[in-house]
Amino acid sequence: SNEFDELLENIKLNLTTLFNLPKNFDVLLIQGGATFQNTLLPMNIDKNKKIGVLVNGTWGKKTYEDFKKLNPNTDLFEVSKNNLGEYLEKNNFENLDYLHITSNETIEGIQIKDFNEVAHSNLLVDMSSDLGSYPFSFDKVSYIYAGAQKNMGIPGVTICLVNKDFLIDVDNSSYLNLKKLTTSNSVLNTPPTFSIFVLNLVTEWMIKSGGLDYFEKKSISQSNELYKFLDENSNLFDFSSELRFRSKSNVVFKFKEDKYNDTFIKQANDSGIIGINGHRLSLIHI
């Protein structure tokens, strides 16, 4: 309908404003979540192109496993715990056409906010858990994707920010053809209308609140208070020790004595603070 077309155009304008989106980028809103991107992306890259996947946590590992099945020309770059800074300084990822990174590993609590830390100029970035929480540069970016439900809406719609130069002609079925999806203005099939409607409301609110600078300051302030407490009580807790890559979106920690973890989570639940046991693979996740 004309009304929905207007809604889509308004969201594109909001996202362009929020992210200061360059003119050579387009906005795509589709279904399938971030996991679907592990299928969509490798199927829309020339099989002769070499892809690398930087793995510094659980979600990056899942991406690598899926990419490798669909594009055997995919290399693994795996980082050991608390060694991301040194790894990025030593690796220039030469001979790669594209490098995939996960900006925020929610289970490990590790975050790459500055893409210039990564020595590659064609980045594919999973920003599912921190898109909308800080400003960043698109200079090295070919493609960004994120499920809206973490910071910018409700489940059902995935936000994709696409460098138009990344799009190529492929002989895939329609919904696996990234170029067709993008040029269809996100309506190749029936779009997730309510999720998109909510996304529009949230992006308008984010702009009125002060944009990405405001949300970055808020996340830094709140996470720093918690990290300060953990640092002061490091004899009690295990958590990320690599200061510059500590996640500002979610702080992950556990008690060194396991018996206290369940007690802490139960007392939080009793106080109305639910879900801090986070993902099924993590312990305490705030």
Stretch-by-stretch model annotation:
Residues 237-267:
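Conserved PLP-binding catalytic core of the aspartate aminotransferase-like
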Residues 35-99:
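PLP-dependent aminotransferase-like
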Residues 1-37, 44, 56-58, 66:
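Conserved N-terminal alpha-helix of the aminotransferase class I/II PLP-enzyme fold
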Residues 67, 79-131:
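Active-site phosphate-binding strand-loop segment of PLP-dependent enzymes
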Residues 148-227:
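Active-site C-terminal subdomain of aminotransferase-like
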Residues 284-286:
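Conserved small/polar residues in nucleotide/adenosyl-binding loops
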Residues 124, 137-149:
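Conserved active-site segment immediately N-terminal to the catalytic lysine
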